[in-house]
C-alpha cells in the first residue's frame, strides 16, 4: 500500500482546533504538526484542493497534512507538513506529487506555488524533487510573522 491522501474530516478539524488528539483517525505519536491548526480552519471551505491528511504508506497512521488554495486567477499555493518522527522518508515529496496529480486535470489551474522557509532547506528539496522550479526569495507572512522564504512554481498543462 502506498501513501494515501484523505480529506480531513470535520471531526478531525474540530479536535485539532480544540487542542485535542483526533479520535476518528489513528495518528503518529508526535501529531499534530506545526501547521495542523491552520489547516483545520480550512476544512469548512475545502474543495478538491484539500485539506488532506497524509497516511503513512507503511503504518496505519496519519503523519501530516497537505492542501492548496487559490491565491489568484489560475494560481494555487500549496502547503504541507510531516511530523518530525516521519521526516526524511520521502513522504512529503510523495504527497506533493499526489496533490499535483489531483490538480493536473483542472483547467482553472495554470501555476502551483510553494513557499519554503530559508531555514528549512529540506522543505525546498521536497518541492524541487516534485518538479517545482525556484523563482525568487520573497517575504511571506505566517501567523502574523514576516518570514523570508523561497518561492517555487510548477506550471501545469493549463499554463
Task: Give, region by region, the residue ranges found by the protein language model.
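Glycine-rich acyl-CoA binding loop
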Residues: 90-93
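Conserved beta-strand-loop-alpha-helix junction that forms the acyl-donor binding cleft
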Residues: 114-124
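A generic structural signal for short
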Residues: 71, 88, 111-112
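GNAT-family acyltransferases
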Residues: 1-77, 81-85, 98-106, 119, ...
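Conserved GNAT acetyl-CoA-binding A-motif
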Residues: 106-115
Amino acid at each position: 500500500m502506498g501513501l494515501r491522501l484523505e480529506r480531513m474530516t470535520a471531526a478531525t478539524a474540530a479536535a485539532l482546533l480544540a487542542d485535542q488528539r483526533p479520535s476518528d483517525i489513528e495518528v503518529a505519536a508526535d501529531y499534530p504538526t506545526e501547521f495542523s491548526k491552520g489547516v483545520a480552519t480550512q476544512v469548512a471551505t475545502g474543495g478538491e484542493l484539500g485539506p488532506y491528511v497524509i497516511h503513512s504508506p507503511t503504518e496505519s497512521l496519519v503523519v501530516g497534512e497537505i492542501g492548496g488554495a487559490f491565491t489568484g486567477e489560475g494560481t494555487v499555493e500549496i502547503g504541507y507538513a510531516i511530523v518530525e518522527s516521519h521526516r526524511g522518508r520521502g513522504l512529503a515529496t510523495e504527497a506533493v506529487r499526489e496533490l499535483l496529480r489531483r490538480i493536473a486535470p483542472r483547467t482553472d489551474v495554470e501555476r502551483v506555488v510553494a513557499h519554503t522557509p530559508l531555514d528549512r532547506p529540506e522543505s525546498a528539496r521536497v518541492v524541487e524533487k516534485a518538479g517545482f522550479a525556484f523563482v525568487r526569495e520573497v517575504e511571506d507572512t505566517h501567523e502574523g510573522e514576516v518570514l523570508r522564504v523561497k518561492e517555487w512554481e510548477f506550471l501545469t498543462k493549463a499554463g
